[in-house]
């Protein structure tokens, strides 16, 4: 089951992510009114190289430590040493690739921008390994504090720099300062005396092998569209697409992603009891979609209001069109999150590798075809097709891992689907009634969102869903 302690732990992480995203929204609101889509496109292109290198070279030290029943000082030293080695390797790879990258994309500014942006992921490699003790105890207040303070300092730096005339460097500064600050704060919250050692590396190696391979494929998969578009479309168009993509994934990154850490810890505790694990997985997947589906559908229905309220001006109008469809694509991809945690908890990282490889294949095939035949909207449509395919792949994978039939998995979600359909219909009717009344975008967005949320919660109530039941096992 998902215990109340797990839910409280998830609440801390979700609160941290929501607080951080709220700060990000304020930062973007300021930057988008000062900078141009081309500035965001340039930074997104530089971040693509950083993201690929960061993901490929990622060592899931915290996840590996969480799975251990007994964590000694030697384990922490090994994790810290691996983090340093990873940071050094990342520095070398990024600096070596920065200049060729700028030549390929015909923009000399990318060299310096890539070098500076690399400081962020390098600093995250040095995160205090002692934080694992809090995670194993289901205490996430410390992670909440570190992330939130980092976001506040990052936002203050970015806003100050843009008003001082720093241009696109304000975006880079936000990324770097946030990571540096969060890492430093972890040492205040979870003190650790650094020591170099690889004495326990064998206990990390099996887990890291498959996981690193999966990360390589994942990096190529998630950054493929930006690399492809960066080469064939203008930086302004790339900026519009990137902004829409970042807004579309806000629900899963803010609500779902952070909640999966305590869920994985809970799965790990009951992995030897298959029946309890099945019940817990069904509850986690239902709760994931309970949150993700209405938010993503709501974003799709109000994409024009979101862009007008947050970004302002006609220069971002194409982002609203892309967001309308990318938000829907995110609905199905959210279902992957609990499956990811399940695979790690039961020591099956090879499953993640296979899933990522399947997704990469379809992304390369469909996004390339979509861009070739229908330009940017074709790429957006391809993203939706890939997410639907991966949803059914995830259903089949869960059946193989813990013996849950696809019919049971889909049946576990039907009330969410019906409630969201009712919400979508009534929100469309409301927007039709409000059309032409010349309301302020922020006011209309707030009213529409509140109306949609009330309808959705009411529909769930009518269908017998009670949110308090989340702390009870699934029957």
Role assignments for model-derived ranges:
Residues 34, 81-106, 112-116, 156-164, ...:
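Alpha-helical transmembrane segments of multi-pass membrane transport and lipid-handling proteins
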Residues 1-2, 6, 141, 145, ...:
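Interhelical loop/hinge segments that connect adjacent transmembrane helices in multipass membrane
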Residues 2-60, 86-100, 115-118, 150-159, ...:
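Signature of the first transmembrane helix
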Residues 399-406, 413, 425-475:
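Membrane-proximal transmembrane or re-entrant/amphipathic helices at the cytosolic face
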Residues 1-25, 58, 63-66, 71-81, ...:
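N-terminal membrane topogenesis motif
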Residues 56-73, 77, 135-136, 244, ...:
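Helix-loop junctions and terminal segments of transmembrane helices
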Residues 4-6, 32-46, 68-78, 91-119, ...:
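Membrane-interface helix-capping segments at transmembrane helix termini in multi-pass transporters
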Residues 20-24, 47-50, 54-66, 116-135, ...:
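Short runs within selected transmembrane alpha-helices of multi-pass transporters and secretion channels
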